[in-house]
């Protein structure tokens, strides 16, 4: 059911990686998970205008390392690195351990699903027509080399009394294929009529890393099985 399941969770361990990397036992797991949620909520609000896409949290021994993926690193770092030092202290208070923050720049924000969804949501809040916002976003993403894009918008569109879902797609987006490199993002637009959800799927091509090794292993196994087979007439008595 590739259409129903979360595209990132479906591909974890295959072509996608976890955004929280740590190990915990017992009650520590719930505490770590809650702290991760608090940190992400805090950074999303604090860096609302910095085009932050993803926040990765790692917990080595007696510390924490946070990587912020953003299209506008200058806003996060601040003048002479002042803002990032303040962020370290505030995040360290939430986690209760020494924290380091790394910044990763997103070179092409048009190919990042969350940033595309967030851009559409902000346009909807400015009362831009939803079809125009969808088509503009899809066109700019396809122009930069995406194989396929799908955008879905749900809610009281144009202030309608009954909520509905509208979607627009260009290219192909194979949700069932595990090796397909599909980026998925969700954003919300808060309008006077209510909340409108924006979902974006971007297909960037097939991830073939490790595929050649797997096929070579299967070929070796098939050769071994073929050699083990006995000829049909081996068990027959010679007349």
UniProtKB/Swiss-Prot annotation:
Listed GO CC annotations? cytosolic small ribosomal subunit
> In which family does this protein belong, per the annotation?
Belongs to the universal ribosomal protein uS3 family.
**Keyword list, A-Z:** Ribonucleoprotein, Ribosomal protein, RNA-binding, rRNA-binding
A GO BP entry: translation
The segment annotated Disordered runs over 215-239
Q: Which InterPro entries match?
A: KH_dom, KH_dom-like_a/b, KH_dom_type_2, KH_sf_prok-type, Ribosomal_S3_C_sf, Ribosomal_uS3_bac-typ, Ribosomal_uS3_C, Ribosomal_uS3_CS
Kindly state the subunit structure of this protein: Part of the 30S ribosomal subunit. Forms a tight complex with proteins S10 and S14.
Going by the entry's taxonomy, the superkingdom of the source organism is recorded as Bacteria
> What residue range is the signal peptide?
none
Q: Which SUPFAM superfamilies match?
A: Prokaryotic type KH domain (KH-domain type II), Ribosomal protein S3 C-terminal domain
Stretches assigned to the KH type-2 domain = 39-107
GO molecular function annotations of the record: mRNA binding; rRNA binding; structural constituent of ribosome
Kindly provide the name given to this protein in its UniProt entry.
Small ribosomal subunit protein uS3
Q: Which residues cross the membrane?
A: none
State the protein's purpose.
Binds the lower part of the 30S subunit head. Binds mRNA in the 70S ribosome, positioning it for translation.
**Basic residues biased stretches:** 227-239
């Amino acid at each position: 059911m590739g259409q129903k399941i979360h595209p990132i969770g479906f591909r974890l361990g295959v072509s996608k990686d976890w955004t929280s990397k740590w190990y915990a036992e017992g009650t520590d797991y719930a505490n770590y998970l809650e702290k991760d949620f608090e940190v992400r909520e805090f950074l999303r609000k604090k860096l609302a205008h910095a085009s932050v896409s993803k926040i990765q949290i790692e917990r080595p021994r007696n510390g924490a390392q946070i990587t912020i993926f953003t299209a506008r690193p200058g806003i996060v770092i601040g003048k002479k690195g002042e803002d990032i030092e303040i962020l370290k202290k505030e995040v360290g208070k939430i986690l209760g351990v020494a924290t380091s923050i790394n910044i990763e720049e997103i070179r092409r924000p048009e190919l990042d699903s969350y940033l595309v969804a967030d851009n559409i949501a902000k346009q909807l809040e400015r009362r831009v027509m939803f079809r125009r916002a969808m088509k503009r976003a899809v066109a700019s993403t396809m122009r930069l080399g995406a194989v396929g894009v799908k955008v879905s918008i749900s809610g009281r569109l144009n202030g309608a009394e009954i909520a509905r879902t509208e979607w627009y797609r260009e290219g192909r987006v194979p949700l069932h294929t595990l090796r397909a490199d599909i980026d998925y993002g969700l954003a919300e637009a808060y309008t006077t009529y209510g909340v409108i959800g924006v979902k974006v799927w971007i297909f960037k091509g097939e991830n073939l890393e490790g595929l050649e090794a797997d096929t070579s292993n299967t070929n070796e196994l098939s050769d071994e099985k073929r050699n083990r087979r006995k000829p049909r007439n081996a068990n027959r008595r010679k007349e």
